[in-house]
């Protein structure tokens, strides 16, 4: 058993009442006072107005008006019901300029930035190319590893590099058996980035890729694919190519119409540029023309003096064959030997490895 003080206190109450009744019986009974009318001293409550209310009026008012019931659309119950309601036009957006699909009957498709760029069969991250750079009678082994590929789609513009990677060359100097550089590239899309440097925007990131228009013509004309591309435009658009990259239009041209030297046909190509056809989509063409620019040495990126006997101040004129995957280029710098040729082929083993892994960001 436990002691419960509540039971003792209840038991003592009747004794007190009994003693009080005995005292009242001994004393004379006083005359009771007349009852006071409720209307004389009403009980009032000040709610929302200054007018007094009776107690029963207040109770009835609370029942009728139901003050404590929240009927707002933003109440907890309404939001819980909204969460279980299927998508419909009656649902409102709670965020300004919200384009998420929950707020409308027809979901709005939000296009991400990565949908504006593409990779090709050979131009993709982790792809490797091997070959040589030829300077006079010397050949130097070259390896190119692509890291990022963001070729803009049709009607899309971007100042971000369309392609980046690492270029390694062996045997260029005796002091450094192998030199590696990080490079960035832009594709010629025939619109705001044309073959001529004068057509490129005046942006700091693009200035390193520019030369004079005459220099551009002298280098582009050395690519057979470039000559075929513009000469065929004058032959009713016969632009089909065979397996060797030769167009049917070029086959039908007399030999004297094919440019052979940069200096002889620079004026002719300049006139072709003035009447350059509007390419529908450069990605649909067999050949993709680019400019590659080496940015700094790796891993010694802080080596500002460079390497004795080597320079990366210039840039490459590049053409890529989307059918064979081959890359051909010419290095240009005003103080370097002209028309140093770059020849690269894709590594088939690396092509399989690069296609095994792909990522998409939502």
Curated annotation (Swiss-Prot):
There is a cross-link at residue 20 (Glycyl lysine isopeptide (Lys-Gly) (interchain with G-Cter in ubiquitin)). GO terms for biological process: negative regulation of gluconeogenesis; proteasome-mediated ubiquitin-dependent protein catabolic process; protein catabolic process in the vacuole; protein targeting to vacuole; ubiquitin-dependent protein catabolic process via the N-end rule pathway. Keywords: Cytoplasmic vesicle, Isopeptide bond, Membrane, Phosphoprotein, Protein transport, Transport, Ubl conjugation, Ubl conjugation pathway. Ubiquitinated by the GID complex, leading to subsequent proteasomal degradation. Residues 240-249 have a biased composition (Polar residues). GO terms for cellular component: cytoplasmic vesicle; cytoplasmic vesicle membrane; cytosol; GID complex; vacuole. It is found in: Cytoplasmic vesicle membrane. The keyword DNA-binding does not apply. InterPro entries: Vacuolar_import/degrad_Vid24. It holds the Pfam family Vac_ImportDeg. Residues 1-40, 240-267 are annotated as: Disordered. The record marks 133, 294, 316 as: Interaction with the N-terminal Pro (Pro/N-degron) of proteins that are targeted for degradation. It comes from the Eukaryota. Induction: Rapidly induced by a shift to glucose-containing medium. The modification Phosphoserine is found at residue 27. It is a peripheral membrane protein. Substrate-recognition component of the GID E3 ligase complex recruiting N termini and catalyzing ubiquitination of proteins targeted for degradation. GID E3 is regulated through assembly with interchangeable N-degron-binding substrate receptors induced by distinct environmental perturbations. Required for the adaptation to the presence of glucose in the growth medium; mediates the degradation of enzymes involved in gluconeogenesis when cells are shifted to glucose-containing medium. Present with 6650 molecules/cell in log phase SD medium. Substrate-recognition component of the GID/CTLH ubiquitin ligase complex. In the absence of stress, the complex exists as an inactive anticipatory complex (GID(Ant)), composed of VID30/GID1, the E3 ubiquitin-ligase RMD5/GID2, VID28/GID5, GID8, and the RING-like subunit FYV10/GID9, awaiting a substrate receptor to form the active E3 ligase complex. When cells are shifted to glucose-containing medium, the substrate receptor VID24/GID4 is induced and becomes part of the complex, named GID(SR4). Belongs to the GID4/VID24 family. This is GID complex substrate-recognition subunit 4. It comes from Saccharomyces cerevisiae (strain ATCC 204508 / S288c) (Baker's yeast). The lineage of its organism: Eukaryota, Fungi, Dikarya, Ascomycota, Saccharomycotina. The gene is VID24.
């Amino acid at each position: 058993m436990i002691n419960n003080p509540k039971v003792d206190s209840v038991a003592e109450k009747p004794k007190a009442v009994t003693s009080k009744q005995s005292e009242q019986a001994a004393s004379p009974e006083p005359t009771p006072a007349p009852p006071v009318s409720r209307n004389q001293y009403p009980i009032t409550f000040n709610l929302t107005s200054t007018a007094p209310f009776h107690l029963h009026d207040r109770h009835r008012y609370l029942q009728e008006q139901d003050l404590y019931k929240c009927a707002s659309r933003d109440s907890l119950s309404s939001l819980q019901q909204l969460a279980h309601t299927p998508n419909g036009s009656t649902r409102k957006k709670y965020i300004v300029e919200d384009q998420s699909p929950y707020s409308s009957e027809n979901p709005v498709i939000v296009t991400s930035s990565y949908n504006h760029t593409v990779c090709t069969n050979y131009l993709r991250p982790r792809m490797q190319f091997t070959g040589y750079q030829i300077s006079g009678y010397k050949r130097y082994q070259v390896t190119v590893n692509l890291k990022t590929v963001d070729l803009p789609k049709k009607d899309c513009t971007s100042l971000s590099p369309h392609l980046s990677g690492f270029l390694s060359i062996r045997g260029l100097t005796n002091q450094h058996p192998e030199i590696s550089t990080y490079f960035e590239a832009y594709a010629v899309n025939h619109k705001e980035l044309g073959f001529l440097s004068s057509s490129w925007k005046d942006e700091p990131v693009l200035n390193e890729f520019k030369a004079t228009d005459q220099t551009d013509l002298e280098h582009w004309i050395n690519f057979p694919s470039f000559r075929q591309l513009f000469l065929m435009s004058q032959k009713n658009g016969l632009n089909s190519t065979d397996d060797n990259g030769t167009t049917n239009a070029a086959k039908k041209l007399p030999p004297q119409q094919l440019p052979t030297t940069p200096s002889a046909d620079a004026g002719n190509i300049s006139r072709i540029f003035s009447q350059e056809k509007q390419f529908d989509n450069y990605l649909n063409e067999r050949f993709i023309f680019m400019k590659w620019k080496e940015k700094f040495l790796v891993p010694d990126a802080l080596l500002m003096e460079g390497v004795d006997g080597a320079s990366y101040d210039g840039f490459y004129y590049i053409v890529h064959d989307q059918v064979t995957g081959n890359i051909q280029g010419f290095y240009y710098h005003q103080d370097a030997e002209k028309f140093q040729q770059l020849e690269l082929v894709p590594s088939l083993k690396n092509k399989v490895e690069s296609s095994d892994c792909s990522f998409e960001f939502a």
